[in-house]
Amino acid sequence: MAMATATASSCVDATWWAYALPALLGADTLCAHPALLAGAVLLAFATAAVLAWAASPGGPAWAHGRGRLGATPIEGPRGLPVFGSIFALSRGLPHRALDAMSRDAAAPRARELMAFSVGETPAVVSSCPATAREVLAHPSFADRPLKRSARELLFARAIGFAPSGEYWRLLRRIASTHLFSPRRVAAHEPGRQADATAMLSAMAAEQSATGAVVLRPHLQAAALNNIMGSVFGRRYDVSSSSGAAADEAEQLKSMVREGFELLGAFNWSDHLPWLAHLYDPNHVARRCAALVPRVQAFVRGVIRDHRLRRDSSSTAADNADFVDVLLSLEAHENLAEDDMVAVLWEMIFRGTDTTALVTEWCMAEVVRNPAVQARLRAEVDAAVGGDGCPSDGDVARMPYLQAVVKETLRAHPPGPLLSWARLATADVGLANGMVVPAGTTAMVNMWAITHDGEVWADPEAFAPERFIPSEGGADVDVRGGDLRLAPFGAGRRVCPGKNLGLATVTLWVARLVHAFDWFLPDGSPPVSLDEVLKLSLEMKTPLAAAATPRRRRAA
């Protein structure tokens, strides 16, 4: 605390000469030259900001000893005055940049917790499973910082961003009990199968026409159809490009794509509020204002149709869509229509992106590693037979398939910084003696953990057997029980749709490998694993591969 006091005093004392300017330069001189006065005052306070930055490990947002509240100080890079580390994190791959920063020998405990500044936002990041568990499990980290785009896109009333409290607990209970229960996930298997069948047929057609398949458009169309069926009870003919249904599907794709871009874009004014009316290169405010009425009209129209259809029924079957489930809730759980719009929109938004991208990463590794593909195909064939069709029940008996999906999530976590950070609502003391001050944004660098040689042996190798206990591997629960690999988060804010996402990815990978032999066409460059981080971690170059049907029909 003494150090914190000294730091604070030095920052205040640094401005002394701003008040001595009249004596130094002469009051008459300054009054006669107002521009000189303004420049001198600006220089004085800029000097104070530089001195505060120089005395603040973690950068300008950590001035006045914020990182030294506990017995163990929180160290970190200073970055630049005013801006902190914003330039290092606003472009490129921030998970890799933070990983490199945390390995700085000048801060030996930075892997546990590292302080840094994103403009005026004080932040910490953990690259250590034990400290990450403390952060994700502590009740004072139950809230999320609400960025401008999330607030304007209605997410403040949805599960992901709603502040902890009675309303958020209601949403979490609805999600776990009514929307994503194991029974309801199982009941939606026919929809997952239908979407996979349509996807495989479309891939077979593209292979026949062009000699190769670009997987991402097919995966995204199937994922959107799948989540639309689960949430709204609607599916579209992905092979049709005309008609009212095709127009509606295109409208939905457009809204989801725009939402992805807005929520995934780095908005400088979230961290430098004084820039809000000066610099908005992504036009966040204008685009959000244009998108929200479209979303509200679309979702309210779906709710209205469901209300009309449900006049004679008040209960929801296990395979009912989410709209029917929400409309069937008892009075004490019933949501206002505006809140239903927010919750349903978030389901569509979050359920489309991750499923498609994880499946693409998985297939990229299958194509890159012929031995993995051969073993996976043998397991699928043994469980299903030559002319069968993999089911959820079959998938549950395929340990190597599950290991391939886990290894994909380890090598390419879809949210390398666990997507959305946490916000400290009170000072939080950690077991290592560090104290995270209230108002601090806390992150977990899951990518750094899954690529740490002290956590995972040979982390750069793609080795599914590391998750097969009978072969000496680890029995890891990826749903938040083990912070060595927690791609869906952990604690109170763990992703509510994790079971649905895992069920979809594993089933679709099984069907893709069962239906086709996958390989690179002659003359093609090797599969590139270069990344780009938008809302999720994507392949920079979409996967394109040849897909030879293994049977007369691909589906």
Swiss-Prot record:
Top EC group: oxidoreductase
**Gene Ontology MF, one:** heme binding
InterPro entries this protein is in?
Cyt_P450, Cyt_P450_CS, Cyt_P450_E_grp-I, Cyt_P450_sf, Cytochrome_P450_78A
Q: What is its main location?
A: membrane
Residues where heme binds: C495
The protein's UniProt keywords, in alphabetical order, are: Developmental protein, Growth regulation, Heme, Iron, Membrane, Metal-binding, Monooxygenase, Oxidoreductase, Transmembrane, Transmembrane helix
Q: Where in the cell is it found?
A: Membrane
Cofactors needed by this protein, per the record, are: heme
Remaining remarks: Plastochron is defined as the time interval between leaf initiation events.
Any idea what job this protein has?
Answer: Involved in the regular timing (plastochron) of lateral organs formation. May regulate the rate of leaf initiation and the duration of vegetative phase. Seems to be redundant to the function of PLASTOCHRON2, but to act in an independent pathway.
Q: What is this protein called?
A: Cytochrome P450 78A11
Question: Which species?
Answer: Oryza sativa subsp. japonica (Rice)
- Give the encoding gene's name: CYP78A11
